[in-house]
């Protein structure tokens, strides 16, 4: 487990928060630790990151496990990817709502009474709002990356919560079938976005 730029206790350089930036961090960590090949798991936005890892350095990837991955949506590219102070200020004003809303990612959020406090801790780190906004502005459609992964015959496994209201399977299932027709797929009963 590692904290990526702009998340948790990591550094938060003022860089565009792209899939490539975060994938490169993981690749550097693997190289630093002497990991030659690994099974890689990505939860939610982490699915985008593992796709990019396989795109950049497919030889490092044994197989890919996508858990409630947000990487299968189509995105219109944003022209102005700069993050402005007014956007940061507006997001910070919404922090209390954001933290409370996190429990809705679970099937039974009341079973995780400390989750709000834990998320509020993330929000205290300098640059957190800027990183989230930059991430959103830098989202791109990954269809070509996924088709490349499929063509390389990298085994792909997808896992979905039956009650996920964040990443809604029916909104992208046709696209997913086109890019990963050979995947192994699993649905988790009594699970929301976070499959705890």
Residue ranges with predicted function:
Residues 165-171:
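Conserved alpha/beta-hydrolase "acid-adjacent" motif
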Residues 152, 158-160, 164:
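Short beta-strand/loop motif that positions the catalytic acidic residue
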Residues 4-41:
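Active-site loop/oxyanion-hole signature of alpha/beta-hydrolase fold enzymes
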Residues 191-196:
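Catalytic histidine-centered segment of alpha/beta-hydrolase-like enzymes
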Residues 31-40, 58-59, 153-154, 181-182:
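Active-site acidic short loop of glycosyltransferases
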Residues 48-56, 62-94:
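Flexible "cap/lid" loop of the alpha/beta hydrolase fold
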Residues 42, 46-47:
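Catalytic nucleophile loop
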Residues 75-81, 92-151:
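Conserved alpha/beta-hydrolase catalytic His-Asp/Glu region
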